[in-house]
Amino acid sequence: MLFFNVASLKYKHHESIQMIIDRIDHLVLTVSDISTTIRFYEEVLGFSAVTFKQNRKALIFGAQKINLHQQEMEFEPKASRPTPGSADLCFITSTPINDVVSEILQAGISIVEGPVERTGATGEIMSIYIRDPDGNLIEISQYV
């Protein structure tokens, strides 16, 4: 379902926009099993699970948060097509990437690709790719 006709939009030059977006506050992952997702992110990546209003679950790390929605029980409003396994996320680590590789392999997780050089938001990164229990692509990167 389209909410607007892209061809009919009249974009203004970005310099005319008064609003300033500073950062992403949180994102939402729709998952097939919240408990399995929490266990993976806690045990493999060291995130912490928290419960907030209405018994909602989230993962926190640093100053970031990922809200978790159970598939077919999403909170409103929600994405147009909430689908487990459709995310591609990049997490930055200060741990040397070779140490990350060792920890990931010791946890019994397969590395999809890497270490490989990529370009992050602020410079060059060295990355490895794994998948979470829903098949989301997880990139773990260190700035070089």
Swiss-Prot record:
Q: Name one Pfam family in it.
A: Glyoxalase
Q: Which InterPro entries does this UniProt record tie to the protein?
A: Glyas_Bleomycin-R_OHBP_Dase, Glyas_Fos-R_dOase_dom, GlyoxalaseI/FosfomycinResist, VOC
The keyword Isomerase is annotated on this UniProt entry = no
| Induction info | Up-regulated following infection of host macrophages.
User: What is the residue range of the signal peptide feature?
Assistant: none
UniProt xrefs under PROSITE patterns: VOC (PS51819)
Keyword Ubl conjugation recorded: no
Q: What does this protein do?
A: Is critically involved in promoting the replication of S.typhimurium cells inside host macrophages, suggesting a role in the establishment of bacterial colonization within macrophages. May be involved in the biosynthesis and modification of the peptidoglycan layer of the cell wall.
Tell me the protein's name: Virulence protein STM3117
